[in-house]
């Protein structure tokens, strides 16, 4: 990153931010799709039932905890990789 000039650093930062937003939107879309498909079964009303609301809450919490855990493991593996690269 130090080898880049200011303009290149700004461009790189913009690309990173765009990728992060794309990843966030993909995560959100997957969450909505999965929890809706798993929890919403009754289309006779325009309101969610208490059971559906509870299911969506549990589903979204579980999905987000899983995503957080995967992110933590990725960070741990990345840290190990960086340590191994520094030892060389």
From Swiss-Prot:
Disulphide bond pairs: 35-59, 39-55
Cite a single GO MF annotation.
Answer: unfolded protein binding
**Where mainly located?**
mitochondrion
User: What would be one Gene Ontology cellular-component term for the protein?
Assistant: TIM22 mitochondrial import inner membrane insertion complex
Superkingdom is Eukaryota
Q: Which UniProt keywords apply?
A: Chaperone, Disulfide bond, Membrane, Metal-binding, Mitochondrion, Mitochondrion inner membrane, Protein transport, Translocation, Transport, Zinc
List the InterPro entries hit by this protein, alphabetically.
Mito_inner_translocase_sub, Tim10-like, Tim10-like_dom_sf
Does the entry feature the keyword Protein transport, yes or no?
yes
| One Gene Ontology biological process | protein insertion into mitochondrial inner membrane
Residues forming the motif Twin CX3C motif are: 35-59
Tell me where it resides: Mitochondrion inner membrane
Give the membrane topology.
Peripheral membrane protein
Keyword Mitochondrion carried by entry: yes
Pfam families per the UniProt record, alphabetical: zf-Tim10_DDP (PF02953)
About its domains, the entry says: The twin CX3C motif contains 4 conserved Cys residues that form 2 disulfide bonds in the mitochondrial intermembrane space. However, during the transit of TIM9 from cytoplasm into mitochondrion, the Cys residues probably coordinate zinc, thereby preventing folding and allowing its transfer across mitochondrial outer membrane.
Q: What is known about what this protein does? A: Mitochondrial intermembrane chaperone that participates in the import and insertion of multi-pass transmembrane proteins into the mitochondrial inner membrane. Also required for the transfer of beta-barrel precursors from the TOM complex to the sorting and assembly machinery (SAM complex) of the outer membrane. Acts as a chaperone-like protein that protects the hydrophobic precursors from aggregation and guide them through the mitochondrial intermembrane space.
Family listed = Belongs to the small Tim family.
| Assembly, per entry | Heterohexamer; composed of 3 copies of TIM9 and 3 copies of TIM10, named soluble 70 kDa complex. Associates with the TIM22 complex, whose core is composed of TIM22 and TIM54. Interacts with the transmembrane regions of multi-pass transmembrane proteins in transit.
Q: What name has this protein been given in UniProt?
A: Mitochondrial import inner membrane translocase subunit TIM9
Q: Source species, please?
A: Debaryomyces hansenii (strain ATCC 36239 / CBS 767 / BCRC 21394 / JCM 1990 / NBRC 0083 / IGC 2968)
> Gene name on record?
TIM9
